[in-house]
Amino acid sequence: MGAPIVKTAAGDVELEERGRGTPVVVVHGSPGGIDAGRAMDRFLPEDRFRIITLSRPGYLGTPLGADDASIDHEADLLAAVLDSLGVDRASVFAWSGGGPSAYRLAVRQPERVASLIAVAAVSARYEAPAPSASDRFLFGTGAGQWLIGFLARRAPGQVVEGALSGEGSIRGDELKALTASVMADPEQRAAVLAFSATVGTNGARKAGWENDLANFAAIGSLELDRVRCPVLLIHGEADTDVAIDFSHSAHAVLPESQLIVMNQGTHLAFYADPNAADIQEKTRAFLAANS
């Protein structure tokens, strides 16, 4: 399900907001879209947070900038979203490929960002690993996306195990145990299955995905040393999508940051891990203390 297209000073954006309380902008990863943002923000209670979720440029209903498809333009679009909603200052919750524009927003408009949560986030030059033939089919074709949806309904455990193995280095008994743990937890199972429907690199996500790959490979510096807000970094040590080195190096440069390392955590650890509920509660507390 899509969302309204809102006109801002920096361009059109697919956008929705709900809840009341501390404003939080949710910046999805690569690939993704507003549906991925909804899966990300499910841990934020609507009676405590004003949740602002969107599709980044090139994903679903948000077009790429006609003249500027840069990371900085995306950061300016996030600021324009705040303007359009009458929000002076907000926290930002970014995952994976949402990291670069979130960091640049904090650099370019520091007065607008109260705090930043960066989960398994890209923080420097990044080149995505070459996809396998099976990944090209599953994520890059309509037939592959249909198959993932079919399996999510008929064999959800297979989808969950595939997602965990594809996003981390754990194997064998550890993978089986983690899969069983996720399948036994309704929230974690639902989160992984929701994300599985948002990771296509074709169709309405293709332009955003290809733009992200080009932009991330060309990163020189995101100027993290200029970020002035408190930053909470969260990363799984077994992440094979965005290596934990990205968060270690960001933590070393950011003026005010905390780093939580999730033992044997995959790229999905914030949502699918034995410690996920505890980490999510720490994140809510961080937002409340730095709003």
Q: Predicted segment positions?
A:
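Conserved alpha/beta-hydrolase "acid-adjacent" motif
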Residues: 240-246
